[in-house]
């Protein structure tokens, strides 16, 4: 079986996705923002399951694709309702990153955000 598809531009995706936004809440940002937060949480939950179950979690790739699709849909709705173009947001990638400093490649831990005297009292 061959899946046939036509690649979409960011703007084409946004235009098609917005035709499925059926909420009649006057264009409020509340619903799509809550949806974006919820779907991002669902994506993080899939990552958690993969870390916990490792190789035994066979549905990971499909679940991540599904959740990322939902995140993208809600991001599109938030952008549109906020008067922004998804193309403009995606175009932000072309800006320079000279203002970003490279962080050291160290493991993230709860202790890394605490002053040493606080961490030593928790040991």
Describe these PLM feature segments:
Residues 1-123:
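Flexible "arm" and connector segments at domain edges
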């Amino acid at each position: 079986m061959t899946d046939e598809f036509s690649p979409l531009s960011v703007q084409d995706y946004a235009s098609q996705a917005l035709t499925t936004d059926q909420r009649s809440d006057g264009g409020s940002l509340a619903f799509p923002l809550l949806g974006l937060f919820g779907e991002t949480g669902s994506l993080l939950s899939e990552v958690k399951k993969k870390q916990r179950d490792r190789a035994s979690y066979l549905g990971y790739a499909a679940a991540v694709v599904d959740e990322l699709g939902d995140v993208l849909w809600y991001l599109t709705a938030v952008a549109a309702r906020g008067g922004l173009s998804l193309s403009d947001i995606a175009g932000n990638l072309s800006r320079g990153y000279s203002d970003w400093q490279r962080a050291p490649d160290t493991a993230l831990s709860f202790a890394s955000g605490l002053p040493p005297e606080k961490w030593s009292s928790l040991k």
